[in-house]
Each structure stands twice: as structure tokens, then as C-alpha cells.
Amino acid sequence: MNTDRKFVHDMKNMLGIVIGYSNLLLDDMPANDPRRPDVDEIRKAGEAAVALLEAWNAPPKGI
């Protein structure tokens, strides 16, 4: 596995933990919990980071 792919793989694994634990917290929080928006932002940031990594690691178009 080349260095870029290994980096993306390792980062996605770590982000998966952040997203997974965020989802667990959200599942256990009441809808009116004042911390809920903050945890949701953490989850969304993790998902955005995964999407960014996937776009960065995608093969170039048109080649």
C-alpha cells in the first residue's frame, strides 16, 4: 500500500471512531439536551473529513 493510501486508510479508521462515538452519544441523548448540537457538529465534521479524504485519494478524472 503506498504512503498516501495508508494515510487515508489510517485517518478514516480514526475518524470512524469519532463518528461512531458521536452517534452513540446522540442515540443516548434526549432531543432537548443542550449538548446535542455540539455532538452533532463533531459528527458532521468527522463525516466531512472522511469525504475530503476520499476526494483527495480518488483517481484523477479523465485519465
Regions found by a protein language model. Give the residues of each.
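A conserved position within tetratricopeptide repeats
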Residues: 25-26, 57
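Conserved DHp (HisKA) dimerization/phosphotransfer helix of two-component histidine kinases, i.e.
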Residues: 36-63
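Extended interaction regions within the primary functional domain
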Residues: 1, 19, 58
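Conserved phosphoacceptor histidine of two-component systems
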Residues: 5-13
